[in-house]
């Protein structure tokens, strides 16, 4: 059993009571919330937890964290659910040690995935080996939040310590990608699915930040320093320091020292290279930079994103540079901002033209203090579910019945998180 049905049912009833003015929200919330627990979570023989992303038979390190994060509220009172989340952290750390460059994994060593098309150092556990900085941030975030929200510490075992060392080592190596063993080439006509320069990636200069091959959308980076992911790395490196200092885990002294150094160098890189100006001359964060003077003004609808910087804990919502960046992102100056008959928001090179992502709409709501904006976005999300009663990867701004991904648990859970935020359940 992954959770106590009685405890979760009682909690859902409490949420429904607080949201009784919004029955449409409640209907979608309950469907999304229970679907993830009932249909994506599997407890394995070793007691760890595998979380299916949805309609793709694999687990993403990023998605699985976001899928279970909204359950931390209930995990405070449900020991079964608490162990399910701890089991996910254990599984994530085990898989990171199988290959820290992989973004998604199989439930067993079955060689399923992109093995016939991808030229990179694969093994049977890997579904896909697109290296994304945030894939290593998310498990650290979940381990920390589970501890702080519920007091659970069983996730901090020997595997966690070893995996944390591996993450710190990899991020240090990738501060100068010339020292990296990672290469990725896919047999494809879609340029976003492969790396240039025989799999090495685009040209860059050393900045102090850590290099990324792909974005959270699983599309390749145009420039190799992805600012939102480096922001996220700064945040979780702070978590690492708190975990190892307060719990006095094995090798605490060296891990704390390494994480402090890395955090300071990445933050300095952000301060020295991450800023650009928008069309109004305002100082904003670039989405990607290469250290050679090139920068992109855009955002990705996934998380981490520039829009999500306060949600990730990197900056305050009222930070001036963030607010200028936010206005720029949510405007036509962002080439992936689309406005239509039913909605406006962020799209992606990963999906069709004029398709926007519910995840980004949820993040827009989670990064404003304006209750009216939150309500507007929740109403919009429910109205644009394509008549399915759940969220999708993306939908057309002029016709929400046109959408991608029939079953996308991450989007479902981001909607749930925004509902809880609106109701002040944090």
What are these regions (language model features)?
Residues 36-46, 110-118, 203-215, 336, ...:
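Active-site-adjacent bridging/hinge elements
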Residues 7-21, 66-79, 138-153, 231-251, ...:
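Well-ordered alpha-helical scaffold segments within catalytic/enzyme domains
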Residues 61, 97-101, 108, 120, ...:
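Extended ligand-binding clefts on enzyme/binding-domain cores
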């Amino acid at each position: 059993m992954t959770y106590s049905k009685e405890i979760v049912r009682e909690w859902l009833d409490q949420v429904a009571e607080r949201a009784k003015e919004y029955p449409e929200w409640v209907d979608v919330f309950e469907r999304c919330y229970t679907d993830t627990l009932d249909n994506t979570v599997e407890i394995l023989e070793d007691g760890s937890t595998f979380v299916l992303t949805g309609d793709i038979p694999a687990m993403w390190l990023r998605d699985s964290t976001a899928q279970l994060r909204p359950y931390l509220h209930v995990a405070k009172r449900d020991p079964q659910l608490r162990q399910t989340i701890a089991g996910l952290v254990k599984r994530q750390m085990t898989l990171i040690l199988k290959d820290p460059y992989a973004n998604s994994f199989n439930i067993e060593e079955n060689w399923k995935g992109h093995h016939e098309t991808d030229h990179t150092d694969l093994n049977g556990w890997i579904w896909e080996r697109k290296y994304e900085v945030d894939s290593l941030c998310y498990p650290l975030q979940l381990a920390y939040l589970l501890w702080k929200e519920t007091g659970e510490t069983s996730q901090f075992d020997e595997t966690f310590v070893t995996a944390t060392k591996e993450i710190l080592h990899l991020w240090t190596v990738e501060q100068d990608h010339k020292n990296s063993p990672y290469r990725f080439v896919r047999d494809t006509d879609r340029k976003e699915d492969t790396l240039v320069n025989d799999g090495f990636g685009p040209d860059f200069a050393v900045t102090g930040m850590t290099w990324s091959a792909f974005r959270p959308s699983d599309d390749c980076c145009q420039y190799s320093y992805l600012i939102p992911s480096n922001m996220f790395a700064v945040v979780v490196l702070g978590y690492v320091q708190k975990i190892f200092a307060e719990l006095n885990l094995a090798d605490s002294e060296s891990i704390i020292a390494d994480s402090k150094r890395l955090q300071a160098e990445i933050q300095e890189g952000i301060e020295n290279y991450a800023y650009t100006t928008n069309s109004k001359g305002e100082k904003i964060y670039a989405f990607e930079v290469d250290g050679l003077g090139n920068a992109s003004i855009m955002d990705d609808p996934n998380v981490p994103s520039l829009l999500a910087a306060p949600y990730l804990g990197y900056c305050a919502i009222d930070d001036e540079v963030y607010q200028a960046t936010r206005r720029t992102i949510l405007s036509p100056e962002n080439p992936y901002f689309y406005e239509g008959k039913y909605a406006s928001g962020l799209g992606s090179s990963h999906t069709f033209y004029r398709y926007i992502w519910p995840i980004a709409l949820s993040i827009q709501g989670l990064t404003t203090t304006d209750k009216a904006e939150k309500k507007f976005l929740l109403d919009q999300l429910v109205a644009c579910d394509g008549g399915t009663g759940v969220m999708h990867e993306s939908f057309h701004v002029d016709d929400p019945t046109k959408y991608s991904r029939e079953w996308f648990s991450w989007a479902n859970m981001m909607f749930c998180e925004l509902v809880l935020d609106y109701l002040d359940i944090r």
